[in-house]
A protein has these predicted regions:
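Short, surface-exposed, charge-dense and proline/glycine-enriched linear segments
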Residues: 60, 82-97, 136-142, 168-173
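Short, internal acidic amphipathic alpha-helical interface segments
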Residues: 110-169
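Generic structural hydrophobic/aromatic packing signal, biased to beta-strands
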Residues: 78-80, 105-109, 138-139, 171-175, ...
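Acidic-enriched, low-complexity/disordered segments with a strong bias for Aspartate over Glutamate
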Residues: 31, 60, 85-89, 118, ...
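Short N-terminal edge-element motif at the start of the domain
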Residues: 44-74
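Aromatic- and glycine-enriched beta-alpha-beta binding-site module
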Residues: 68-131
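Long, solvent-exposed, polar/charged low-complexity segments
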Residues: 1-54, 149-209
């Protein structure tokens, strides 16, 4: 299951060169593009299966297999929004994490950076207004670097203070679903749906006017 995604995770950071300009690496680049596209297609299939279980949420497009600089970007993501949500609202998303030998998909409450408005960060900070539930964790951005923070009441208070002081720019709430070789797609979708329901209160809190 999701074999192309797993294989493509090992290509993180690899530079893609158009095959016609790649000289002796032409075939290698053709294979790289084919793998990237196949991995993205698997992510699209998964995202669509998940969308069918999350009505009224609608999926956005899955991220590209390479960025504008043509660097491979295998940690695909896909955002989900309710019909009433604006583009600058806080949304729900799934995102790949890990390496080929140990990986999974996280569900998160976050927003699209390039679509944010003056109010988006303040909305995102409201995820800290609710107590953190077991099995969830925070992902905090400090000085441009994001790092995992264990989901405890003590850390919630610490992050609230850090946000107030301007030391932490944004805090996501996340839930990890490890992917195993023996798992089937239906089981994975079920676990991701469960993650969505665990995180939904934080999404609702963030978008409350």
């Amino acid at each position: 299951m999701l074999e192309n995604i797993q294989a493509y995770l090992s290509k993180q950071g690899v530079k893609y060169i158009k095959p016609e300009k790649a000289g002796p690496h032409q075939e290698e680049m053709e294979d790289l593009k084919a793998l990237g596209q196949a991995a993205r297609k698997e992510m699209q299939t998964l995202a669509k299966l998940l969308e069918e279980r999350l009505a009224p949420f609608k999926m956005d497009r899955v991220s590209n297999w390479a960025n504008q600089a043509q660097i491979c970007r295998p940690h695909f993501w896909c955002y989900y929004r309710a019909p009433e949500d604006s583009l600058d609202d806080v949304a729900m998303a799934i995102r790949l994490y890990g390496q080929s030998e140990k990986w999974g998909i996280s569900v998160e409450v976050s927003f699209v950076e390039r679509k944010k408005s003056d109010t988006t960060l303040a909305k995102q900070h409201k995820v800290l207004d609710l107590p953190i539930a077991p099995s969830l964790y925070y992902f905090a951005q400090e000085n441009g670097v994001s790092h995992r923070v264990e989901g405890t009441e003590e850390n919630r208070q610490m992050l609230k203070e850090a946000v107030r002081d301007g030391r932490v720019r944004k805090v996501l709430v996340k839930y990890d679903v490890p992917v195993t070789a023996s798992e089937i797609m239906e089981e994975l979708v079920e676990e991701l749906v469960d993650g969505f329901y665990k995180l939904k209160p934080y999404y609702e809190e963030a978008n409350q006017n």
